[in-house]
């Protein structure tokens, strides 16, 4: 091997070794393997979620958010995430941040029924809809929610007492999986957030996260259980 590969910040660097013969070469041949993501199944993701138990032993960190963007739209995967979240190693609690499928739910009025019918109703779930975009890139909203929660926690000395709701998010729009724009008025966003207990985004003079309820709401009205910020403390 004449080179080594490593990441630095957001860049992938290829560095020739000191004794490499490639310094004098006119052409370089670089070989690599590419993961075939098409072979991943929902069952693979479910098995991966089970290994969250090993995080403390392997890296010395216990996750407090479990996220599987692109897969938590499968109700079975979401259920496994929620089942694992409340008791990691029998000691630690987390929240499963899950997405509602925008291929099926393409309008805000369908959110509550789909959520209820498909079991996204756990106090260990932060349920999210729709997708979001930044420029030409589409993201599952759970990615944005996890990032914002982590930032808010970090700003508060890693104490999770503050809600992520009504905090700015760096996106340029809300969309469904097919790219269709989702434009919500404040009352419509409240139908998703307050009536359905689902976290969404709202453009009200700037994009913000909108919603502070866990999946168990509105069935549960216990303040200690239904709010993201009180339940996580």
Walk through the language-model features, giving the residues of each.
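Surface-exposed interaction regions enriched in Ser/Thr/Asp/Glu
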Residues: 1-43
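A glycine- and small-residue-enriched flexible loop/hinge signal that marks low-structured segments
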Residues: 43-233
